[in-house]
């Protein structure tokens, strides 16, 4: 399991579910929930993350800006994995610093596995 988890969630209902699940798992001491990905800038510069999961609304491409911000601020370690849940028909233009490793199609969903490069 993970030593520490940082959730970024704006939706109040989803945050309540996260909190309830953390309580159920007795994992509150291993997790924090923040509202905005830009709040990561308040973390220690030494803190690095190795797994990112993006599940934006299908029509929303703003997550690409989030990936750029993570790269610009070096919030990732060398072994990072980025997982993105998209509509299978979506066409996204990723930054050159994001390398797609592989994609999987499940029904109308596309799951993209990638990595941020230094």
Which residues are covered by each model-predicted region?
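Class I S-adenosyl-L-methionine-dependent methyltransferase catalytic core
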Residues: 1-118
């Amino acid at each position: 399991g993970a030593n520490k988890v940082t959730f970024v969630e704006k939706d109040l209902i989803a945050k309540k579910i996260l909190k309830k699940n953390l309580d159920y798992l007795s994992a509150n001491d291993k997790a924090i929930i923040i509202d905005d990905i830009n709040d990561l800038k308040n973390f220690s510069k030494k803190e690095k993350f190795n797994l990112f999961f993006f599940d934006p609304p299908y029509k929303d491409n703003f997550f690409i800006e989030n990936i750029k911000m993570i790269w610009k601020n070096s919030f990732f370690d060398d072994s990072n994995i980025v997982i993105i849940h998209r509509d299978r028909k979506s066409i996204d233009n990723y930054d050159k610093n994001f390398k797609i490793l592989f994609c999987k199609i499940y029904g109308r969903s596309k799951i993209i596995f990638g990595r941020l490069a230094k």
